[in-house]
């Protein structure tokens, strides 16, 4: 977790980092919690302002509810949400938006389920370094999100039925100042439904060096680094979906600077996650396939994540992440810290839920290939 804690939290406690050698007083074995801190810990929640115990906030159809609003400088350190709603697909229908420093365009604009990891509209218990879904449908995010002037969080009900109960607890710190190189958290959502296959002539070698027809995970411009990706896959064809190699293009390079060996390898698994008959879900600090159902079959589902906490992918001008041909219907998110900037709207609600409601075998003329990611950028 040093990629986030080192970039943001340490600077708040001690001031900006310098290149000078540490003094003898700074060379100590003490953890941060044993040292004096210079921030104020606070929380905004949905608690009952009357003093009663009715802490829920209903969100009517088509309405937006503000759940957080504070002046900076500061850092959001933890977001907890839980929802009771009659619609089975409310995780796809409720959109989370986060705004920094008064910018009218959100830096995060993602369906709630896709942001927290249950990206196929299904709650499942898992844990990782930055996101988790606890038992009884509690959603948690532990990415540090700094802001200089202000931070604002809203949720919008884009479904067709009222959300009866929306609860929130958002922990944050107010700090005297932030380091000059502080970056802002962004999350970019994309989906492809269905994701068409790439066809090769009969007998031709399946060569792909430049990613011209690859599936796009994420594209952005500016300066920052990629912290991680979440991916949701809904298969619309038989057999293994995950042989696509990831390709990472940095700062407008025409050729990838990083090329991987397959989708399950990028998510730090192997061998088709165990295959059609032996797949077992797993969830670790920095990688996981926390939901696997009916693998390698039409209607099969996968929820995956990968955090680059130990080695974020840095860029100065632009970043593109592609995958070799992808079979299934897809949705994905990328998390990146960077200056305030690029916005990408999620697709309309009917398209977000389409893959969950209607899985069909593709035309026999289409040879499906694999992959569907969800990305969360933190810039």
Task: Label each residue range with its predicted role.
Residues 1-14:
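N-terminal export signals
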Residues 17-376:
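Beta-strand-centric surfaces of beta-sandwich/beta-rich domains
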């Amino acid at each position: 977790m040093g990629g986030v804690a080192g970039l943001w939290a340490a600077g708040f406690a001690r001031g900006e980092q310098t290149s000078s050698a540490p003094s003898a007083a700074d060379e100590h074995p003490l953890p941060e919690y044993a040292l004096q801190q210079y921030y104020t810990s606070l929380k905004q929640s949905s608690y009952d302002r009357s003093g009663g115990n009715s802490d829920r906030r209903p969100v009517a159809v088509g309405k937006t509810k503000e759940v957080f609003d504070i002046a900076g400088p500061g850092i959001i350190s933890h977001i907890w949400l839980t929802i009771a709603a009659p619609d089975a697909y409310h995780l796809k229908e409720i959109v989370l938006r986060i705004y920094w420093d008064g910018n009218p365009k959100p830096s995060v604009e993602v369906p709630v389920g896709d942001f927290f990891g249950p990206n196929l509209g299904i709650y499942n218990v898992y844990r990782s370094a930055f996101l988790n879904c606890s038992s009884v449908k509690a959603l948690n995010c532990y990415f540090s999100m700094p802001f200089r002037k202000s931070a604002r969080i809203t949720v919008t009900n884009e479904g067709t039925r009222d959300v009866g109960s929306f609860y929130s607890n958002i922990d944050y710190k107010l700090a005297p100042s932030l380091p000059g190189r502080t970056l802002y958290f962004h999350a970019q959502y994309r989906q492809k439904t269905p994701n068409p296959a790439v066809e090769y002539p009969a007998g031709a070698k399946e060569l792909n060096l430049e990613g011209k027809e690859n599936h796009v995970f994420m594209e952005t411009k500016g300066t920052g680094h990629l912290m991680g990706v979440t991916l949701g896959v809904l298969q619309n064809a038989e057999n293994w979906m995950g042989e696509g190699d990831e390709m990472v293009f940095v700062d407008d390079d025409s050729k990838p600077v990083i090329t991987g060996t397959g989708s399950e390898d990028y998510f730090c698994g192997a061998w088709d996650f165990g295959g059609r008959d032996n797949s077992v879900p797993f969830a670790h600090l920095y990688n996981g396939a926390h939901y696997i159902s009916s693998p390698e079959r039409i209607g099969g589902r996968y929820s995956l994540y990968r955090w680059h906490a130990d080695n974020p992918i840095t860029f100065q001008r632009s970043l593109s992440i592609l995958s070799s041909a992808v079979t299934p219907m897809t949705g994905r998110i990328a998390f990146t810290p960077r200056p305030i900037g690029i916005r990408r709207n999620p697709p309309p609600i009917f398209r977000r839920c389409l893959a969950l409601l209607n899985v069909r075998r593709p035309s026999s003329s289409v040879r499906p290939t694999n992959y569907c990611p969800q990305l969360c950028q933190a810039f």
